[in-house]
Amino acid sequence: MKIIVVFFGRGKNTSRALRQRKARRSSLSEHSSYQGATVPIIESIDVCAAVVPLDKVTSFSNRTVSTRHYGLVKVRSTDGVEGIGFCYVGSAGGAIFEAAVQSLLGPVLLGKDSHAVEGLWQSMYQEALLQGRQGTVMRALSALDIALWDLNAKTAGLPLHKFLGAMELETVPAYASGGYYLDGKTPQHLGEEMASYVDKGFRAVKMKTGRLSPREEEARLKAAREAVGPDVELMMDCNNAWQDVTQAMQYIRRFEQYEPYFIEEPFGPDDIDSHAKLARLTHLPIATAEIGYGRWYHKELLDKGAAGILQTDAAVCGGITEWKRIAATAASYGVVVCPHWFHDVHAPLVAATPNARYVEFFWDDQVLNFRKLVDRQLTHKQGRVVLHQEPGLGFGFDERMVERYGKWTRVAR
């Protein structure tokens, strides 16, 4: 009997495969060594309420502002990386923000891995169930969440828009925001202001409305439209001016012929049904949610058809973590997002969000005087905001200016 023994697997191809398997095992071994590497543990949090006066007293449709309170935080990890976060508290109430960070939310983060963003968000939200879910406590949560994203993007060595997964890499579309009420400001002055933004390259601009009578507001809108021409998107911000749908329609009927891009915040934020009724009575898109907290509020807006455009603010709604959830939900309803205020944080979010349309851009620090507190400004080019390319948000606080308007307090273990 003849026995034939055949040997397999010793050719060139098999040798190559063995080398590849060894290389993979080596690579896995290297990756597994991360368990012994430094993990970014949150070591300390600094909090400050900065009280910054406006250069000129400025009016909206239903209130006048002379001072702004900003909530600032710095979250530092054991590897020496620092992330910053911030929010607008209001014309008062900075002390509430500081207390929320020091006593309620900050201690939740200390000693934790900064990468656990979803879990940390849930822990902070749970801790604030009795005191928060809206208002200043939710804004404090938002600021801390923003700081975590900034910290983690810096740790990864990526600008925030790339860390999030960018749609746009260099610039994002923006509209110039202004048109506030000032003593002695005429419709002609308003028109000149709007035209000046177009001269700077913006193809979309926004003005305030709702403070004056329907006839007077129509005159302001007419002057603005004639100044910018028919091809520039012209937005109108009511700042919750109207009390009911009947009153709103007295204005809207006069506005429709000038084709504004949207009507913003016609009613108070909690009057969702009136937003929905107005949306059914006019072809003009209704924009709202800049003071909206949490995904559940936004879902009700969407379910009732109360918003054609969401203006969700990451420094209000629950931070970048919650903003991303809300934007994704809006996309499933076919609704676009044009986030409110704070172009410094919203530019990278718009860059990473398919259904985000515009960044609201303030070209000076008269109204958004938060600009005085940061060490580097976003720039614009041909109506688009130029994204920072440095890791994280791409800027920090101007400590000299922060010291002028507030004082840091440290929260540590």
Predicted features along the sequence, with ranges:
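Low-complexity, intrinsically disordered or signal/transmembrane-proximal segments
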Residues: 20, 31-35
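Structured beta-strand/loop patches that form or line metal/cofactor-binding pockets in enzymes
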Residues: 38-84, 88-90, 366, 371
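Conserved, mostly hydrophobic/aromatic
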Residues: 42, 80, 144, 157, ...
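Shared catalytic-loop signature of beta/alpha-barrel
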Residues: 103, 253, 259, 270-384, ...
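Metal- or metallocofactor-binding catalytic centers and their adjacent structured scaffolds
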Residues: 44, 76-155
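Metal-dependent enolase-superfamily TIM-barrel catalytic cores that perform enediolate-based chemistry
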Residues: 165-282
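Polybasic, lysine-rich low-complexity intrinsically disordered segments
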Residues: 2-3, 12-13, 22
